[in-house]
């Protein structure tokens, strides 16, 4: 088994989380299955949510037998590709399906399974404190308009910190990534300069020259840890696990916000209050104390499966992952629990 594969034996239910565009289709799924039946489920996709999938599978295995779940953290883009070509039963993605993708696979279902913060992590020799990054500054770092750590715009936002006169090494994803999609949506929303500089939005974009790249959130975090003078974007759990420094980012209200669970939850609540659809993105939350860079992570599944036992297993695990216990494991890992409104809609759709 590859180190990054999460393969565990689980039982009377297993993975899935579905709903979104047509919850009523779940009513076609059978309600139960024989406890002695063996079921195998395959998933792939998001590295953003991979630690939570791993934790869920491990914990579910404690009290369940008979179902094998595999989840391969290959990135959202590759996970969606495998889902579309039928090589996996479900996929994890930090980006909703495009119109073209939905056309290619009618009846695809999506549901936010968790949410998390995208941090801007850095490794600056001699700087051991939290730095503040104004909105226009971190946009221009990613555009490569700001090249040195002692740039006056960085220094003026951080009085008292002696920045070294050295190049900024930008670390980005080399694979097709929902984390990249969420970041670039945010950057183009907060700054017209993003598009004006010829930058794109999506899971895979052409970055300016002279950047460092790595696969997956884990790879980006490791590259930042090993590269002095570097900065990059990475999901909170990965930055925390490697003890990376994380910047306080200026939010829409003009406040500098450290990535904390409370600040992330405020960001999600500002969006849920406005939109009730489960495929909503949070690109620039308006809360006074909201952390500005957050993303849902979705699970993709089919409305109907030829194997009805497999369909039942997916639905049953979906209920478990939406439970207080399932969401609690996410909180333990630094993810943001889904709001009561989103959980209620999801659970009701599964009942229907």
Residue ranges and their predicted role:
Residues 5-12, 29-352:
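Flexible loop/hinge segments at secondary-structure junctions
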Residues 12-23:
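Hydrophobic membrane-insertion alpha-helices, especially the h-region
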Residues 1-2:
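N-terminal hydrophobic targeting signals that begin at the initiator methionine
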């Amino acid at each position: 088994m590859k180190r990054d594969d999460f393969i565990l034996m689980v039982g009377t239910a297993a993975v899935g989380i579905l709903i979104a565009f047509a919850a009523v289709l779940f009513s076609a799924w059978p309600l139960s299955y024989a406890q002695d039946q063996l079921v195998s489920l395959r998933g792939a996709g998001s590295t953003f949510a991979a630690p939570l999938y791993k934790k869920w599978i491990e914990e579910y295995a404690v009290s369940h037998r008979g179902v094998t779940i595999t989840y391969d953290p290959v990135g959202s883009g590759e996970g969606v590709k495998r889902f579309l070509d039928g090589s996996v039963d479900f996929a994890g993605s930090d980006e909703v399906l495009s119109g073209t993708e939905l056309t290619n696979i009618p009846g695809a279902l999506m549901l936010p399974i968790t949410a998390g913060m995208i941090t801007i992590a850095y490794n600056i020799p001699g700087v051991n404190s939290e730095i503040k990054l104004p909105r226009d500054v971190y946009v221009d770092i990613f555009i490569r308009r700001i090249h040195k750590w002692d740039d006056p715009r960085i220094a003026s936002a951080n009085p008292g910190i002696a920045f070294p006169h050295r190049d900024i090494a930008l670390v980005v994803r080399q694979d097709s990534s929902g984390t990249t999609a969420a970041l670039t949506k945010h950057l183009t929303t907060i700054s017209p300069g993003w598009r004006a500089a010829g930058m794109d939005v999506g899971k895979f974009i052409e970055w300016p020259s002279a950047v460092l790249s790595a696969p997956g959130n884990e790879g980006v975090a490791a590259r930042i840890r090993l590269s002095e003078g570097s900065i990059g974007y990475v999901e909170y759990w990965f930055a925390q696990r490697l003890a990376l420094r994380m910047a306080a980012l200026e939010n829409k209200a003009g406040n500098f916000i450290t990535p904390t669970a409370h600040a992330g939850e405020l960001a999600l609540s500002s969006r849920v209050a406005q939109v009730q659809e489960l495929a909503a993105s949070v690109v620039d939350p308006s809360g006074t104390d909201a952390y500005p860079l957050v993303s849902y992570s979705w699970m993709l599944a089919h409305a109907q499966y030829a194997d009805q036992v497999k369909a039942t297993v997916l639905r049953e695990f979906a209920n478990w992952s939406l439970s207080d216990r399932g969401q609690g494991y996410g909180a333990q890992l630094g993810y943001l629990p889904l709001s009561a409104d989103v959980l209620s809609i999801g659970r009701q759709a599964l009942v229907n």
